[in-house]
């Protein structure tokens, strides 16, 4: 199939050499802006579907780019954006159909009473606005967040992102932010190993219930609880059953509202539902969406209830976002949602996700370096460990696998989690069975190499230990021989 720019008769701009690109980046881009594969970064010049191509034409299978939700440069999405850009793009203070059609389609996917939209340009902006809505509605300040959470790069959302503020050099957490344990039943504060018979959802909800009770005792309550429906940076975490129901009840009893951050996991990725929060049978008060919504184009939205939206309007301060809800962004978002429906991508994510989980669990039975496999749809995490019984994370192996998958197998994956030992899979939704098998084949080779290296290290250590024992025994024997010789000389001298 021709690339999208070829279908539209567009001519790609002339490329710099990779060396020149790196040189200019080092000169003009802040060093805090990190790259994948920093020792040998990829220069990507084209994309198509689930594939990306470097400057030499090498094709890579993309297993991490949930930004390109329906596939890189999907022709219908590209066409919709190009057509609207060639027609008109302006701010949303003028009437235009793409905005209202986008809002209608987006809210039609939401449960009642989530029916009012505010459009933004990114997940960070969406979460920032969600906190504003919550604090305005409740007239409170305090926010509960989860450990290892990441909600964006703006100051307001960095404050509720332990993934960032707990790093070396991170700013201290404000007193009005309360951090509860991430509901990770494999490697978190409470594990299914420690509490094999416990209700893990209730157990992890308890710290939040205690925070709410303390806030009420002080006469303050809380403004909001914010959480990703499935935590991504925390290591592809699926909360235990009943967790969000118990948490939402506690937060609302303390006067707060519940914010679902769907920036990473929304728009059908989990397969069983359009939104990941639906897997827990809860209805948030505010939902934040972005990233996959624009398939690589900057667009996002906050969806909330008429009551919360009206309270925001009642302040008398108009909300205006120059690019939020512009015609081009909305045309692209509309095209993305059409493609999800027309190509049945949600159902495909369900079927393929089940296949990936099943096959990764087969690998777990074969390779001791896999501690846990978890996921929903095309959101999968594979936790690598040094010791399965003790669940000791293996960050070194995870990094080695990520780089070997790229260099040898031309498959792009990443690692994350508090110990950076979880292999993450979040591919474009056009990912297919053949792609899954390609990943599995390369991953198997990497795991085989990891285990062979461990065996070699263990054998080497055992040989070194044996050599040490032999050397010690030899030295002891020599010492005893010398002792006997001295005793013999003494006897003869007498």
Curated annotation (Swiss-Prot):
Record key words, sorted: Lyase, Pyridoxal phosphate
Modified sites of kind N6-(pyridoxal phosphate)lysine: 291
UniProt-recorded Gene Ontology molecular function terms: ethanolamine-phosphate phospho-lyase activity; pyridoxal phosphate binding; transaminase activity
Enzyme class: lyase
GO biological process assignments: response to nicotine
Source taxon at top rank: Eukaryota
Matches recorded under InterPro entries: Aminotrans_3, Aminotrans_3_PPA_site, PyrdxlP-dep_Trfase, PyrdxlP-dep_Trfase_major, PyrdxlP-dep_Trfase_small
EC annotation from Swiss-Prot or TrEMBL: 4.2.3.-
Gene3D superfamilies: Aspartate Aminotransferase, domain 1, Type I PLP-dependent aspartate aminotransferase-like (Major domain)
Cofactor: pyridoxal 5'-phosphate
Family per record: Belongs to the class-III pyridoxal-phosphate-dependent aminotransferase family.
PANTHER family associated with the record: ALANINE--GLYOXYLATE AMINOTRANSFERASE 2-LIKE, PTHR45688
UniProt protein name: Alanine--glyoxylate aminotransferase 2-like
Organism, as annotated: Drosophila melanogaster (Fruit fly)
Lineage: Eukaryota, Metazoa, Ecdysozoa, Arthropoda, Hexapoda
